[in-house]
Amino acid sequence: MSTNLRKTHPLAKIINNSFIDLPSPSNISAWWNFGSLLGTCLILQTITGIFLAMHYSPDISLAFSSVAHITRDVQYGWLIRNMHANGASLFFMCIYLHIGRGIYYGSYLYKETWNTGTTLLLLTMATAFVGYVLPWGQMSFWGATVITNLLSAIPYIGNTLVQWIWGGFSVDNATLTRFFTFHFLLPFTIMGLSMMHLLFLHETGSNNPTGLNSNTDKIPFHPYFSYKDLLGLILMLALLLTLTLFSPNLLGDPDNFTPANPLSTPPHIKPEWYFLFAYAILRSIPNKLGGVLALLLSILVLFLMPALHTSKQRTTQFRPLTQILFWSLIANLLVLTWIGGQPVENPFIIIGQMASILYFSILLILMPIAGVIENKMLS
């Protein structure tokens, strides 16, 4: 009797061990669907992105009109562009839910997987930022100007660094060209790192809702979880297509329908919705350098999660105190997202400052303390 090819062929064996015969915990819930959804998002974004790049011109005199040309004259160009723009929103929605699941169920204790994942988040944010500049609308231009300008807060080398990134003394043609280059390059870096992320995950196996060792109760990934993931995939694609076909500009900024004009500043400069929480933290500190550091720390705090875990239990499933803090953190992030989109005036300033303090307090102080208290209550 000959052995199954998928178990012997060098290439097929890798795929088999990663997606077919992979031993998976029998009790993982729908919260474990997001990894495959993110992979799908990445593939979808790459395909639509490549088709857009075929018709796009990274030049300040042509960029805006080339995007208009794509939506008007290219076969299904409107669909490709809207799927790419809204696909990014869906990508971040899945990322945030994936990270939230990781925090709730203590998945961050797989340090290598968690650290590669956090690095993936940073790379995805960088990709989304440079991509937002490409249509060369008002918000693209001013977003690029404001965010790159933050680097000038770095002592001594700040101004030189900003000019080096701009490729001149202002956001200009050189900036657009290099941003297009990075936007094309980074997704492939993300793909490579995603494979590393999976490699590290398969070294330990998946976590599960109980946080206990599940080696005694594993089932093959296919057909059980491949079909379960397929349901999540259909729901995600339904959401993406609904957004793309019925309300494609819902999450965009109206200012981006105006070509970039260095002589006119939009009344409210704000990023896409998925960056608003970090933008609110940045704005809540009156000092420029302090704001930049807080902005960085708001994401980099994820790297500290394994070190801040004080509880004897892995998941939050059986820890009521930490659960309250976790959901307070989620509510707080929603408040920050709302504040990020509001003008800099009272009462929004003080709400933003309070929410920023609470964000760091929950993650760095209250959650570790709650873990210690819960340990005491158990003993």
Swiss-Prot record:
Any one Gene Ontology cellular component term annotated for this protein: respiratory chain complex III
Coiled coil: none
Domain of life: Eukaryota
Database matches in InterPro entries: Cyt_b/b6_C, Cyt_b/b6_C_sf, Cyt_b/b6_N, Cytb/b6-like_sf, Cytochrome_b, Cytochrome_b_C_euk/bac, Cytochrome_b_N_euk/bac, Di-haem_cyt_TM
Residues involved in heme b b566 binding: 98, 197
Residues that hold heme b b562 according to the record: 84, 183
Known cofactor(s): heme b
Keyword DNA-binding: no
Entry's transmembrane regions: 34-54, 78-99, 114-134, 179-199, 227-247, 289-309, 321-341, 348-368
Assigned keywords, A-Z: Electron transport, Heme, Iron, Membrane, Metal-binding, Mitochondrion, Mitochondrion inner membrane, Respiratory chain, Transmembrane, Transmembrane helix, Transport, Ubiquinone
Subunit structure: The cytochrome bc1 complex contains 3 respiratory subunits (MT-CYB, CYC1 and UQCRFS1), 2 core proteins (UQCRC1 and UQCRC2) and probably 6 low-molecular weight proteins.
Note: Heme 1 (or BL or b562) is low-potential and absorbs at about 562 nm, and heme 2 (or BH or b566) is high-potential and absorbs at about 566 nm.
The protein's name in its UniProt record: Cytochrome b
Originating species: Terrapene ornata (Ornate box turtle)
Lineage, top ranks: Eukaryota, Metazoa, Chordata, Craniata, Vertebrata
Protein's gene: MT-CYB
